[in-house]
């Protein structure tokens, strides 16, 4: 049905045929879209865009490389002259910065630990408190077992002292 010309009531056929469009169902006033006709143009546009961007980036990278080399050429004599001062100063600054970062990290860890401990003592049940309670129970059970075994061994030792022959 879609390949036949529509005529009669409902329009379509008479409008398209009277203006040279062919009047087939689905046609757009006599023009048709063929995607294969636009492919070479589309590929050419893609290629031109990609090549333009690529050349721009290549030029920018060349300028950056040139600027870096010129900067090193200018800075090298200064670095050689001042290296007996700059190298120890850089090492000292790095050690000082590392020390400050380490002490700050220890301070933050101490504050976090004290905050957790305060929450635990006040009964707010912070994260991980259930594992601490479980570990406390396990340690108490083991301590009770050791105490019972010690009593058993002490009682067995007294019993052996009372028997003759030992």
From Swiss-Prot:
* Family matches, as PROSITE patterns: OLEOSINS
Which InterPro entries does the record cross-reference, listed alphabetically?
Answer: Oleosin
Provide the membrane topology annotation. Multi-pass membrane protein
GO biological process per UniProt: lipid storage; post-embryonic development; reproductive structure development
Q: Where is this region: IgE-binding?
A: 2-9, 141-155
Keywords in alphabetical order = Acetylation, Allergen, IgE-binding protein, Lipid droplet, Membrane, Transmembrane, Transmembrane helix
Sorted alphabetically, the Gene Ontology cellular component annotations on this record are:
membrane; monolayer-surrounded lipid storage body
Carrying N-acetylserine, the residues are 2
- Membrane-crossing segments per the record: 53-75, 85-105
Q: Name one GO molecular function term.
A: IgE binding
Tissues/organs with expression? Expressed in seeds (at protein level).
Q: Which domain of life is it from?
A: Eukaryota
Role played: May have a structural role to stabilize the lipid body during desiccation of the seed by preventing coalescence of the oil. Probably interacts with both lipid and phospholipid moieties of lipid bodies. May also provide recognition signals for specific lipase anchorage in lipolysis during seedling growth.
Entry's family note: Belongs to the oleosin family.
This one is known as: Oleosin Ara h 15.0101
User: What is the native source organism of this protein?
Assistant: Arachis hypogaea
